Amino acid sequence: GAHTALVFPSLLCKVETVGESLKDKDLAAFLDCCLHRYILPTLDNRAEAEAFAKAVLERFANPYIHHRWQSIALNSISKYTARVLPTLLDTVAGGAPVPRPLAFSLACLIEYYKTRPVTDDPKQTAFIKENPIPAILANAELWGTDLSFLTDTVTICTEKLHQSGVREAMQWSM
């Protein structure tokens, strides 16, 4: 879920590759927050989780691999649903509040889909472009479940994006 959580904040910051994101203090802090506060705690074996995180960060930092965010962004609705949403849902099911960094990542995905050309299912893309956040989140066909409970948080994240810019909104989300 680390790639998926970071892709749209990075693209909205006009950062083109994964390696560049790791060198960017704001994006690196966001990734660290997502990984260590939300993704890793949902994995069963703590030692395996830490080894996984280390391997992910090493792969992301490899200067010989130029993972372009535009390529990673392909089909992001299904990727978010499979890779980030389970962590978000597990966190909330455990009684914790909505994890703002993961909701911010979703707000960035929606903002990107609304404002830029994307390569994804044309029907899904059109639905996002044409509808407000509450309708987008309530659409179980997009996310596999009704995400209406995220409306307030994602709306606030989006307002922060518009009012303060990506970096300040990202800092707020952490």
Residue ranges, per PLM feature:
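Non-transmembrane, aqueous-exposed alpha-helical and coiled segments at domain scale
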Residues: 1-174
